[in-house]
Amino acid sequence: MSLRVRQIDRREWLLAQTATECQRHGQEATLEYPTRQGMWVRLSDAEKRWSAWIQPGDWLEHVSPALAGAAVSAGAEHLVVPWLAATERPFELPVPHLSCRRLCVENPVPGSALPEGKLLHIMSDRGGLWFEYLPELPAVGGGRPKMLRWPLRFVIGSSDTQRSLLGRIGIGDVLLIRTSRAEVYCYAKKLGHFNRVEGGIIVETLDIQHIEEENNTTETAETLPGLNQLPVKLEFVLYRKNVTLAELEAMGQQQLLSLPTNAELNVEIMANGVLLGNGELVQMNDTLGVEIHEWLSESGNGE
């Protein structure tokens, strides 16, 4: 069964967005079909960011009611065009974010030449404007969503190994951390580094503007002889925490972040991004490692 997807015309959608904004400020703004009677003149800014249509007779009636009758005489619309072009501000645009400098005025055309579809009708101080195209509304900051959080993980190191090793790992084994590092990640992005101190950790560097993509690939210089030699990247996660943007910014100011009690007893062991087990952070001779307490291997060795 095919999906019934509602089609949205971007031009009309932008007009509708502006209409809603104008109505919020007490202006009359409606999307409607203009009459195709009489003559029309299209206006736009020099950058062609917006365009609108006016009826010369309507414009004259608001500028000079005494001259409005001239609009019905043959060729009177063509006299309005140079007048509009020569006037610095022929009207006040009812849409605040639009520019009216260097107005482009086209020659009059009959109503039959108007574009298909609805136009946005807004009254200005010089009569009605029928907008055909409008740019996007300026972005308005709605504040930070307070409920939005980002998952951080504090990684103490990693080791590169092969798939065949995973089948031989069991509870009580110690996985050595070959590459010691103290890095903060949000998803696959490295945010910075941290130091372990008494009572918690302190984030030393945190650069949200220039975050790095984590490299999860293990390079090999030769063709793999079999599936058991597929590369596996083990990652050891000391702690995870979901934070708000305000909390994330505070971390960059070297604020002490308290660790949960016995965090060193619950280090997560990730393999290619998948949780396989957890254990205790230990030091074997001069090398950090994790002694496995729980192991979720598919081999059946361990739990």
Curated annotation (Swiss-Prot):
Q: Which gene encodes it?
A: spaO
Keyword Transmembrane helix attributed: no
Q: What does this protein do?
A: Involved in a secretory pathway responsible for the surface presentation of determinants needed for the entry of Salmonella species into mammalian cells.
Output this protein's name: Surface presentation of antigens protein SpaO
Which Pfam families does the record associate with it?
FliMN_C (PF01052)
Question: Keywords in UniProt for this one?
Answer: Virulence
Entry-linked InterPro entries: FliN-like_C, SpoA-like_sf, T3SS_OMP_SpaO, T3SS_SpaO/YscQ/SpaO
Annotated SUPFAM superfamilies: Surface presentation of antigens (SPOA) (SSF101801)
The species this protein belongs to is Salmonella dublin
Q: Which GO terms describe its biological process?
A: bacterial-type flagellum-dependent swarming motility; positive chemotaxis; protein secretion by the type III secretion system
Q: Which domain of life is it from?
A: Bacteria
Family statement drawn from the similarity comment of this UniProt entry: Belongs to the FliN/MopA/SpaO family.
Concerning NCBIfam families, the annotation shows: PRK08158.1, SpaO_YscQ
Membrane is among the record's keywords: no
User: Record's PANTHER family?
Assistant: FLAGELLAR MOTOR SWITCH PROTEIN FLIM, SECRETION SYSTEM APPARATUS PROTEIN SSAQ
